[in-house]
Swiss-Prot record:
It is an enzyme of class 2 (transferase). This is Probable dual-specificity RNA methyltransferase RlmN. PANTHER family: 23S RRNA METHYLTRANSFERASE, RADICAL SAM CORE DOMAIN-CONTAINING PROTEIN. It catalyses: adenosine(2503) in 23S rRNA + 2 reduced [2Fe-2S]-[ferredoxin] + 2 S-adenosyl-L-methionine = 2-methyladenosine(2503) in 23S rRNA + 5'-deoxyadenosine + L-methionine + 2 oxidized [2Fe-2S]-[ferredoxin] + S-adenosyl-L-homocysteine; adenosine(37) in tRNA + 2 reduced [2Fe-2S]-[ferredoxin] + 2 S-adenosyl-L-methionine = 2-methyladenosine(37) in tRNA + 5'-deoxyadenosine + L-methionine + 2 oxidized [2Fe-2S]-[ferredoxin] + S-adenosyl-L-homocysteine. It comes from Synechococcus sp. (strain JA-2-3B'a(2-13)) (Cyanobacteria bacterium Yellowstone B-Prime). Residues 99-332 form the Radical SAM core domain. Reaction proceeds by a ping-pong mechanism involving intermediate methylation of a conserved cysteine residue. S-adenosyl-L-methionine binds at residues 160-161, 190, 213-215, 294. The active site is at residues 93, 337. PROSITE patterns: RADICAL_SAM.
Length: 352
């Protein structure tokens, strides 16, 4: 028997057709398999009832590449966090965020994260490895299966730095679009910033939204909060964002987590406005998403008072910088951005 693409999840329509033909089956069997994997979300080839029984039995032992759900936690607002177990025993987290018109999935790109941002729970757990293509796609299918509705938006804002797993993440973006049917303009890639990688991303002919996690308006403070920033001067990062917008025609969003008494003062807002005006001088669009901090047990930072948040917005708007305060979802389910954490592992008895 010819080698089967393993895992099946992540294989393109043409690859699955070619495999079916190599098995002595008509090409449309590969098309059927593609539909059952990406649209029906099967977990085993035994579920593909349109296949001839003999052939289904011959190939049923080959893995689709789906992860198992270890834990599911639902918040009062309907946000659901999934703890997923990978084939090698590693654990990742995925968040499904529903609204009346959208279903957004916050996907992870790595097990843990090497960036070690001082305020981030994922950064505190360290880095294990990059995720593989099927492990990223599986997160979207898991949420789609659980909610019983199509995923409309995907944000790479879960565990990990996507641009440190760039090739696989770009493969995943293309597959989300071509195989699962999610528009590229409904996909957001969030990055803290990795030298030379934003320029690389701009050359990939994608139409995704780039979200850059700034979290500070000056280099000194940013290095305190994000150790890796010492290798990527803020002025260079902003210039790379400007070049990205000019090359792709896509707006860049800037993420800014507000930490009480640390980066949320009026002087910080004015510095941030001045910084971003560098990127907007050529008429390119930019937008700031302000994220009031979600407290975690691993860090001493606090959430700012709402009046402080409103004043920060006012200062930005006075300087013609558009800003939105992001609605925090899933706080009671421990699922909001920055709260992906190892609570499950800590609940297990003994040493792991």
């Amino acid at each position: 028997m010819s080698a089967l693409p393993i895992p099946l999840l992540g294989q393109s329509l043409s690859a699955l057709k070619d495999w079916a033909v190599a098995q002595g089956q008509p090409a449309y069997r590969g098309q059927q398999l593609h539909a059952w994997i990406y649209q029906k979300g099967i977990r085993s080839l035994e579920q593909v009832t349109v296949f001839p029984r003999a052939w289904r039995e011959a190939v049923q032992s080959y893995p689709v590449g789906r992860s198992r759900i270890v834990q599911r936690t639902e918040a009062r607002d309907g946000t659901v966090k999934f703890l997923l177990g990978l084939a090698d025993g590693q654990l990742i987290e995925t968040v499904g965020i529903p609204t009346a018109k959208r279903l957004t999935v916050c996907v992870s790109s790595q097990v843990g994260c090497p960036m070690a941002c001082d305020f981030c729970a994922t950064g505190k757990m360290g880095y294990r490895r990059n995720l593989e293509l099927h492990e990223i796609l599986d997160q979207v299918l898991t949420v789609q299966e659980d909610f019983g509705r199509r995923v409309s938006h995907v944000v790479f804002m879960g565990m990990g730095e996507p641009l440190l797993n760039r090739d696989t993440v770009v493969q995943a973006i293309r597959s989300l679009n071509q195989d699962i049917g999610i528009g590229q303009r409904h996909i957001t890639l969030s990055t803290v910033g990795v030298p030379r990688q934003i320029a690389w991303l701009a050359q990939q002919d994608l139409q995704v939204t780039l979200a850059v996690s700034l979290h500070a308006p000056n280099q000194d403070l940013r290095q305190r909060l994000i150790p890796s920033a010492s290798h990527y001067p803020l002025d260079t990062l902003i210039q790379d964002c400007r070049d990205y917008m000019l090359r792709t025609g896509r707006r860049v969003s800037f993420e800014y987590t507000l930490l009480s008494g640390v980066n949320d003062l009026p002087i910080h807002a004015r510095q941030l406005a001045q910084l971003l005006q560098q990127a907007s001088r050529s008429g390119v669009q930019l937008h700031v998403n302000l994220i009031p901090y979600n407290p975690i047990s691993e860090a001493d930072y606090q959430r700012p008072h709402p009046t402080r948040v409103r004043e920060f917005v006012r200062q930005l708007e006075q300087h013609q910088v558009r800003a939105t305060v992001r609605q925090t979802r899933g706080l009671d389910g421990n699922a909001a951005c920055g709260q992906l954490r190892g609570s499950f592992l800590r609940s297990l008895p003994g040493d792991l």
